[in-house]
């Protein structure tokens, strides 16, 4: 990281990463999605979830005085399988009965400042989260599925943007969405029908920024145990890949470190080979069909490189996509809370 920072400071940093950081500073997220576009996306998700479940799950934006600020990668607003994970977050919060919101100011969990080794850019991106939490008056911050975002949050957030002494001290700062979900599972507030995922047999990819550069939960190894416990709570068919290809021995997806650009596709395909080999082996030996991950870059990378290895792009799934599939929606909502209730569709 020090070498990258030196190169960036003399103007020879990674073009792709600097373009991404520029979008965050100018607009608020890596994809350059303005607030109205995010609001429109979330409104669409509410309608989709209601059509599927007849439950009015809310995906709130910029709501003050709620318990939780969810900070998630902007990929979750944009494409599969990311958006399926976002749908799952909302369903979990709904069933847990907690109040929450997302923020247009902090509409990006990712922090590409880390990839160019720039402390100043890491700090500026992180401060958006602090400012949003203060403005909205939340009690806790929960991060969505993003590997390097979790690394920055877990390892550096307090020194980059702290102190966070204005948050509720009863909760960790930050908290991962998998931690939140597992806690609700263990408390018995969530009910699942595992058979909803019986069309898949799952394995899990340990994203390197989570596996080797952070922790999760209150004990060592939680970053390995917690996501797997969540997965096993919602599926009937799960198998790990070979022991020397997972946990702290995991392989990079091939797209991390600022490589996630089509200009470097040849490098990305070659970089993915060790993980693809391990995945193919567990497919052949155990009948696994899908790979789950909790990293936006990993999911984006595998979506692109799977076809190069004879696999379907839809074989990569979000962990909270699996949660969403299996979650039984017991907290029913009255008709007047349905999206579009009271609107007159007739032309006048």
What are the residue ranges of the model-derived segments?
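Active-site glycine-rich loop that binds ribose-phosphate moieties when present
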Residues: 123-129, 180-189
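Short amphipathic alpha-helical segments
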Residues: 83, 154-157, 216-217, 303-307
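Local cysteine-cluster metal-coordination motifs and their immediate loop/turn environment
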Residues: 1, 72-77, 105-116, 120, ...
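Residues at the C-termini of beta-strands that transition into short coil/loop
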Residues: 104-106, 177-178, 206, 242, ...
